[in-house]
Amino acid sequence: MKALVWLASALTATVLLAGCGGSKDSATTTPTGPVASILKVAPDQLVYRNTTTLTITGQNLLKGLTINNYGCFTMTEVGTGTDTQRVYSCKMITVGTSLLKVYASDNSLIYSGTLTVPVPALPPQVTMTTTLGSVVMQLEPSKAPISVDNFLNYVESNFYPNTIFHRVISNFVIQGGGYTAALTQPTTQSAIVLESGNGLKNVRGSVAMARLTAPNTATSQFFINVVDNASLDATNAGVDGYAVFGAVVSGLNVVDLIKAVPTSTQGGMTDVPVTPVTITGMTRSQ
């Protein structure tokens, strides 16, 4: 999309675990002899945004494993594994049931199962306080787990206070979370993969990740659609479009106040509010 320059975040769904060390890099050579086989994969707990430990038991496990689970982020081996047992920990970033597959070093599927994370009784909500009022956003971890976890990481690290809405287009979007009033950019976390095409649409009041032209480039910046923007929806999931991860459930009138502020060109950027609209607080309220 040419009308905006987007910024934004990247998680990896597949973790390669080479033999004898839990490396996340794939092995350059294929081990000889028998490949691994699995008897059991046992998680200790499955709680949204908590760490879970997976204990894998079987045979020849040091020959190399590839574990694939979309909702299990930052897979790390715990301790020193053996040929009959390896233990890994990861952060569960999705809710509901996700598929878990394990492949041997020859790429054969040696285990297929599921991990089910109970849906929280109350969906996550974030309250954003600005110089023009407060906005409550409800997030959708079942539809956009990577984007939601990324956004909450920024919220919990107190990243957003003193950033501004730096792009305001009254018949399009309000975009913020990436610049200070001096139009400097705070240091962000790593970029995330694009979760467009997740079933959530860029309609009025929806909240989505901003990004650069390339798909997997979102970091901290987000935007709120002030009108229905079907042109921002994906035609090729994960390749184009913009990933919606939540919606405004309270304070849409404040969004309308923000979209109406006068703007100008500043620091080489267009559509910057003449008087900064500053995010003064961002906290998880549910």
Please identify what each model-predicted range represents:
Residues 21-286:
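Cyclophilin-like peptidyl-prolyl cis-trans isomerases
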